[in-house]
Amino acid sequence: MKKMKIFGFLISFSLFFLSPFVCQANYDSNFTRPPPRPLFIVSHGRPKFYPQQVHISLAGKDHMRVTYTTDDLNVASMVEYGKHPKKYDKKTAGESTSYTYFFYNSGKIHHVKIGPLKPNTKYYYRCGGHGDEFSFKTPPSKFPIEFAVAGDLGQTDWTVRTLDQIRKRDFDVFLLPGDLSYADTHQPLWDSFGRLLETLASTRPWMVTEGNHEIESFPTNDHISFKSYNARWLMPHAESLSHSNLYYSFDVAGVHTVMLGSYTPYESHSDQYHWLQADLRKVDRKKTPWLVVVMHTPWYSTNKAHYGEGEKMRSALESLLYRAQVDVVFAGHVHTYERFKPIYNKKADPCGPMYITIGDGGNREGLALRFKKPQSPLSEFRESSFGHGRLRIIDHKRAHWSWHRNNDEMSSIADEVSFESPRTSSHCHSNRYRGEI
């Protein structure tokens, strides 16, 4: 414990001098938030063969990927699972990877794809033949379905509060639009982050995309980026025919979700552009009536922090999303919450997606408090507070969105809206308003 306190102090000390700060002035809301919290370090304290940092993610139709780490390199990449506690009637082997960074060694990172699994069913599982028993519930195969959403998590007391509030109400899938651990090359922080979220991420699938804090260019001849992220957070890119772990898609219930990469090429000649174009063309709105997109850098924002950083990506990809009739676009990066009217090409458009910035998970850099004034008529609601969101898809036509502000022991609903998919509007469905993808 003493070593962990020293480690936490050294990390906090270095980050204090190396990290940018958000000026806490010109507050655009009447809700007052205390200063940012220090890092919340979670130690292991178990034998080396014990699985740790357990999390799950969707991995194609009726399958789940279980990821865990062991310090002992001899532990098998294997998951036992079944529908009853301590009774595992199935066992699946997987793969493993590892990486080094100067004197740091990641240990053995295991990825095991299990299934086929039944929808809306609780499974019990054990990793590597050792350690604790975990359990998860698979998402439903049809509506309703509920997503919990929070970006820019980090690992502070505010992160803990956000995760606690999310845990209080059930959900089916967690969406994280980038900036996970805020390790920023301090590799032990990846381990601490994995331990911090294990109690939640081992029970429901976490679907994530990368942010700028995941870039972590390694000081090698080839300057590899995203090495830690790609090793630890293997998403279903192969299952969605993407050649990169930085962008992919997945289906759950009646929702097709596309996770885009803000920090990998997206221009019209890029692999990501061609993959996105092909992916959207294959969407069958009879099978997946809802279409959701998640990315890190917002295309629309009225906050002064990172203003305009998503403009090039918007110019390259927005028309694809519009023609595909995307319903909702989530982003992070700006440490605030903001919800826009349906937009296309910087104008209100009832056939465009509803854009939501939700980079308020609890990161160490604090909140982005400086909004542009007066408030744009396109911006429906904005507030600089930590919290999380809930997207509940009720049926093929109706959905409900709510944003839950972290308020001491309670998680109060500060913003909510019920809406219908633009796809169901005869005006928006007309080919007169849509071109080919």
From Swiss-Prot:
It comes from the Eukaryota. Expressed flowers and siliques. Binds 1 Fe cation per subunit. The keyword Signal applies. It comes from Arabidopsis thaliana (Mouse-ear cress). It is an enzyme of class 3 (hydrolase). Homodimer. This is Purple acid phosphatase 21. Glycans are attached at N30. Its EC number is 3.1.3.2.
